[in-house]
A protein has these predicted regions:
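Short structural boundary motif marking the start of a folded domain
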Residues: 2-7
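Short, hydrophobic beta-strand segments that form beta-sheet elements in well-ordered domains
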Residues: 8, 78, 92, 177-180
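Short polar catalytic/cofactor-binding loops
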Residues: 10-15, 44-46
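Short glycine/threonine/proline-enriched tight-turn/helix- or strand-capping micro-motif at secondary-structure
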Residues: 17-28
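Glycine-rich beta-strand-centered segment in the early N-terminal region that forms part
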Residues: 28-46, 54-98
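NAD(P)H dinucleotide-binding glycine-rich loop of Rossmann-like/cofactor-binding domains
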Residues: 70-77, 87-156
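Mid-domain Rossmann-like dinucleotide-binding core that forms the NAD(H)/NADP(H) cofactor-binding site
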Residues: 126-204, 208
């Protein structure tokens, strides 16, 4: 590939994001400067935080401007480097732009050199071994200190962190009940994620349940 494809913001999002809010742009592949390295992005994480960056309103991050490249956590591989700490072939997790190739430097946000385990797909590092999985694991074990035989109730159970929390709790021998916002999500967490039961907070009586 000789060009760098980028997903850019075509218009601000006011409700649920639609395809027309985004556009595809192409440009040259950048060259790393001194202390930088070029990353070939392989996987991106669809983070809830991105929604807050594409509405034109400032929050803890500056909003992405119209025409700006969408950003989010990614996993990629170094293909060219002028940084002694990152060499060609290294796998890297970082907050990058949604593009084929990104320039990174040592002080990039969330930058981490990965040491992939044999047999573990690299995509897991933006999923179950990424932020969502870590949040679920720490919340259950370090904060909740769950024990086998307990009942664990998970809110937002169909989301990234909630679905991971439910599956981890099941593996630990707990009964798991998930709270979701639709019958479709209720069926999903029971049939696909292995929850014992689901509550649709929009239609079910949570107190009675």
């Amino acid at each position: 590939m000789t060009t760098n494809r980028q997903v850019v913001l075509a218009s601000y999002v006011t409700d649920a994001a639609q395809p027309e809010n985004f556009a595809l742009s192409e440009g040259p592949i950048p060259e790393p400067g001194k202390g930088e390295f070029l990353l070939r992005n392989m996987y991106f994480s669809m983070e809830p935080a991105i929604r807050g960056w594409i509405d034109g309103k400032a929050n803890y991050f500056e909003p992405i401007p119209i025409g700006g490249v969408i950003r989010g956590p990614s996993v990629g591989q170094v293909i060219k480097s002028r940084n002694n700490d990152f060499v060609e072939g290294d796998f890297v997790f970082a907050l990058n732009q949604w593009e084929d190739y990104s320039i990174c430097h040592s002080d990039a946000i969330l930058l981490e050199k990965l040491q992939p385990e044999a047999g573990v797909p690299i995509s897991y590092y933006v999923g179950s071994l990424g932020g969502a999985g870590a949040t679920a694991y720490i919340g259950l074990h370090e904060v909740g200190q769950i024990q086998a035989g307990q009942t664990v109730v998970v809110s937002a159970a169909a989301g990234a962190t909630g679905s991971m929390a439910g599956q981890i709790a099941k593996l630990c021998g707990c009964k798991v009940i998930g709270i979701v916002g639709s019958d479709k999500k209720a069926q999903l967490i029971v049939d696909e994620f292995g929850f014992d039961a689901a509550i649709n907070y929009k239609t079910d009586d949570i107190t009675a349940a």
